[in-house]
Amino acid sequence: MKKLILTLSLFALVLGAQAQSKSIAALKDRYKSNDDFFHMELGGNFMNFAEGFKIDLDKNDMATVAKSVEKLNFLTLPEGAPALAEYKTLQKGLERENYDLLMEASEGKSGVLIYGKGARTFSDLVILVGDEKEGDLIVVELKGSFTQEMLAKAKGQMN
């Protein structure tokens, strides 16, 4: 009986670790039947993927971040979708799911928001890019293990 309980607990833990944000899953379900909806999901060791395509990653900082990515979800809404409304709905949904706003950069009603879930180590990063002029919404969800120091180094490399 103990083995059964232990096995079920381990199984539930693994499923919980691989769970996608409910807000992002709802967005994906809303548009999955639309032919113009783009969704790409990559799993496994992201660094091996990057090396296979000869993507140049700085071996000291960006490579560490890339190796930490276990799963990547990339979504873009189809043209004509109410992108600004979806952008606001997704923001509220992520906040309800206890994601913390890590960074915000905006110009007018367009902008980039980065949300993280976790305390010292983040298990999930969500990047929202919304453009009111173009009516676009791009969502990037990264699952893995990201430390604050690692993200600070990666940000320094981008500047």
Which stretches of residues belong to each language-model region?
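A recognition module on extended beta-rich or small alphabeta surfaces enriched in W/G with H and D/E
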Residues: 148-159
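Early exported N-terminus immediately downstream of N-terminal targeting peptides
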Residues: 24-81
